[in-house]
Swiss-Prot record:
Source organism of this protein record: Mycoplasma mycoides subsp. mycoides SC (strain CCUG 32753 / NCTC 10114 / PG1)
Keyword vocabulary terms for this entry: Cytoplasm, Methyltransferase, S-adenosyl-L-methionine, Transferase, tRNA processing
Chief localization: cytoplasm
Cited function: Specifically methylates guanosine-37 in various tRNAs.
Transferase listed as a keyword: yes
Protein name per the record: tRNA (guanine-N(1)-)-methyltransferase
Length: 240
């Protein structure tokens, strides 16, 4: 998988990809990340890529010409072009899986300032938001896209790891514990120390349903629950 990130702030992207799982994925050649400085496509003095908006108003707007030049410099027939914007569809695990499973090259355009010339949307395949709040620029959103998609690709993390993560099968992850066994009168559940793998698996499945019902009931899809989880779900719903 190749990611091409079009940004005004390459250092933000570079500092993140030099750490942790993303760095290891790059070293293993599971992913490739190309950082594209939007200012390199400006034809104006001081590499200007923004200007005042027609009709008046506060805030600068990203100009269409450097944006399109940057996109076209890396786009191929196998590319999908994403724009990070609060006007886009909200990113979730289902969308992440779609990108991970269906594309070889993802171009991410980082939004900035007051916005972008509306005409750029003719060159965008998907607009993506990471939530209903405002951040300074699209760099953080682009890194969230890269990180979440990369985790699902072969040879990035162990298959077992992402199968057990939150949002797989529309459930939150089960509680996890480590040493010490007891802290301020709070003990690790005994089942986890029993060595009985079937009981541990059963407990974890129960806890996934319980936690999701309490914290994110909107996530649950009963068609994705196994028989044991469905029993817990029905019991919990009956108690409410």
């Amino acid at each position: 998988m190749k990611f091409s990130i079009i940004t005004l702030f390459p250092k933000i992207i570079n500092s993140y990809i030099e750490e942790s799982i993303i760095k290891r994925a790059i070293n293993k050649q599971a992913i490739k990340i190309e950082i594209i400085d939007l200012r390199n496509f400006s034809t104006l003095s001081h590499n200007q890529v923004d200007d005042y908006q027609y009709g008046g108003g506060s805030g600068m707007v990203l100009m269409i010409e450097p944006l399109i030049k940057a996109i076209e410099s890396v786009k191929t027939t196998k590319s999908i072009v994403l724009l990070t914007t609060p006007q886009g569809k909200t990113l979730n695990q289902s969308i992440v899986k779609t990108y991970a499973n269906n594309y070889e090259h993802i171009i991410i355009v980082c939004g900035h300032y007051e916005g972008y010339d509306e005409r750029v949307l003719d060159y965008i395949d998907d607009e993506i938001s990471i939530g209903d709040y405002v951040i300074t620029g699209g760099e953080l959103a682009s890194l969230i896209l890269v990180d979440s998609i990369s985790r699902l690709l072969p040879n990035v993390i162990k298959q077992e790891s992402h199968e057990n993560e939150s949002f797989e099968n529309n459930l939150l992850d089960h509680p996890v514990y480590t040493k010490p066994y007891e802290f301020r009168n709070k003990k690790v559940p005994d089942v986890l120390l029993s060595g009985h793998h079937q009981n541990i698996k059963k407990w974890r499945e129960e806890q996934q349903v319980i936690k999701t019902l309490k914290k994110r009931p909107d996530l649950i899809d009963i068609t994705k629950l196994n028989r044991h989880q469905l029993e817990i779900y029905k019991k919990m719903k009956g108690e409410q």
